[in-house]
Amino acid sequence: MQLKTLDIVCSREELGRIPEGKVLINTINAHSYNVAQKDADFAEALQKGDYLIPDGASIVKACRWIKAKSQPKERIAGWDLFIHEMERLSLKADAEFQVPSSNLPDGLPEGGSLPMGEGGGRGSQGSLPIGEGGERGSVVMFMGSSEHVLQLIRERCAKDYPNLRVVTYSPPYKPEFSENDNRQIIEAINQADPDLLWIGMTAPKQEKWTYRHWDALRIHCHVGTIGAVFDFYAGTVKRAPLWWQNHSLEWLYRLLKEPRRMWRRYIIGNVKFLRNIMVVG
């Protein structure tokens, strides 16, 4: 995979021009670029998604340095994408019919849960409001992470976006999903039929899973693979203060906070990124 030939979103303004419908939005940074050099499936998932967001100052600078096809003007973090899409859906929900809880489907109580799957995954806050004439409230779904993190996300969403209905699904915690796991995840997503879907299983797993099962997802909404944002929004991991973000040093902040986990990714990884850019482009 060559950075020089990738189609990358160049500014935050472009996020507002993403069309309605089933759209896959991935992010790319130095680490994911490095991984893609050795993982052909991951590289294919990134290249064949609909939109690719430059989630790293290193990507922005490297595109300028090698005179790449895309010239992003700024870093667009996964967090920026998340806030943009949540605000977009919230504004849309404000203009739609507000559905009373009495119109919930039979057998599913308000604030109810999707059933526990055989593989351990389960959906929670699975209320799907159905309005008269088949209309329903706007639904945002979070697929991934632990039930603890998802509970915190539901609580924060209730405060930040009270006009949105939240559905969550915590998949089994394992390196690879079984066919049964995949079937249950797909069924949960299709049952929720969300107006916005977030996939959070860390790269490259989340991108490869979403791309591999794209055709099986019978949905018509924006889908973002945003891994760490689940933890940021839940508050289980804190983002760098604005000064660090504005000076393109968020990576250094994370390294200082979690040196044992991040040293290989950022110290060795940044060197590999420079080498890959010079060799591969």
Question: What residue ranges belong to the model's regions?
Answer:
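Short, flexible loop segments at boundaries between secondary-structure elements
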Residues: 171-176, 219-256
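A transmembrane-helix-recognition feature enriched in membrane-embedded lipid enzymes
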Residues: 61, 239-281
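Conserved beta-alpha
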Residues: 67-94, 137-188, 192
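Proline-aspartate-enriched helix->loop->beta-strand connector
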Residues: 189, 193-198, 202-203, 210
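N-terminal nucleotide/polyanion-binding subdomain common to many enzyme families
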Residues: 1-83
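Short glycine-rich anion-binding loops that position phosphate/pyrophosphate groups of nucleotides
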Residues: 30-33, 201-206, 229
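A short helix->loop->beta-strand "cap" motif at the edges of active sites that frequently abuts
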Residues: 22, 137, 218-222
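Intrinsic disorder/low-complexity segments
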Residues: 91-137
